[in-house]
Amino acid sequence: IALAFVIVMYVCFTFCYTEMACAIPKAGGAFDYVNLAMGKNWAFVAGLAQIIEFLFAPPAIALGLGAYLNLFLPQIHPLIIAISAYLIFTGINILGIKTAASFELVVTVVAVLGLLLFAALALPHFSISNLEFGKMPKGFSGVSAAVPFAIWFFLAIEGVANVAEETINPQRNILIGFGSALFTLVILCFLTFSSSVGIAGWEKVVFPAGSQQASDSPLPLALQTLQVSPYFVTLIGIFGLFGLVASFNGIILAAGRATMEFAKSGNAPKPAAMVNQKFKSPANALIFNMVIGIIALLTGKTGEIITRSEEHTSELQSPCN
């Protein structure tokens, strides 16, 4: 139910946001749209909501990346891997939009191929009874609690708008970008949800056998229940890394532009508004975002931070809707 609600919400939102992005191709996204429509005070609220999302989603993804790599490199702490990821991908984005976007395209294609492989392995074992549509042990409060996690299927798709200012023919290409992104995410959302939960129930992709602690690697866990070759389990784990990298790099890319535009209006430290003259990238904004993200990582509460940031983002954006 939570997933169905989120799909409808994001389809409606994306259509509206695409129209604004094409009409106002600015790096600030929601901040610039609200500034023109409702003035600087409401623009501050919308811009802050956007930056909260862009600042606090990457730490959770970085820690997930660390947890995945820790399966292959158990001698390295996940936190060290997460901080290293921040340094590496912030560096890639500082090199400029062409480098960052080209890298993003490659890792995204690999990640999509991985999800398609997972679906091909799992869907033959799908049973609709495993989805348990009629069982709601927590009632609608459970559905409400699941919404922030369902949002992760589409999180930060609005970041497409933040690169509109650097896009050739944005009225055409931003439309194509948003449309293809939404179509891809909806299809992959259905495939991934159905082929994971639908093979043995949600418990089998959350809790490892004999444990009550939630796993950070649900797709390999799902394949283990099917007793497929360990080769495929490892391969899906590697593809999962590419998915996390694609999400992480994509949000860093959009976040740098959003913070830069926010700073141009005096709402963030002025140095964050500066563009690197050599690479033509918002280097200072990217570094500022990285520092905040690493601090969030060091708190050890990235899951709680992202859940609360999504809730507060919705609260901040509601007056602007």
Regions found by a protein language model. Name each.
Residues 25-27, 36-41, 165-173, 180, ...:
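Juxtamembrane helix-boundary/capping and inter-helix hinge elements in multi-pass membrane proteins
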Residues 316-321:
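Positively charged, low-complexity/disordered segments
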Residues 2, 13-15, 81, 128, ...:
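Short alpha-helical transmembrane interface motifs in multi-pass membrane proteins
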Residues 32-33, 39, 70-71, 177-249, ...:
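TM-loop-TM module centered on a large, flexible mid-protein loop between adjacent transmembrane helices
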Residues 4-8, 48-52, 84, 106-109, ...:
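Hydrophobic residues within alpha-helical transmembrane segments
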Residues 11-86, 90-94, 99, 240-261, ...:
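Hydrophobic transmembrane alpha-helices that form the core helical bundles
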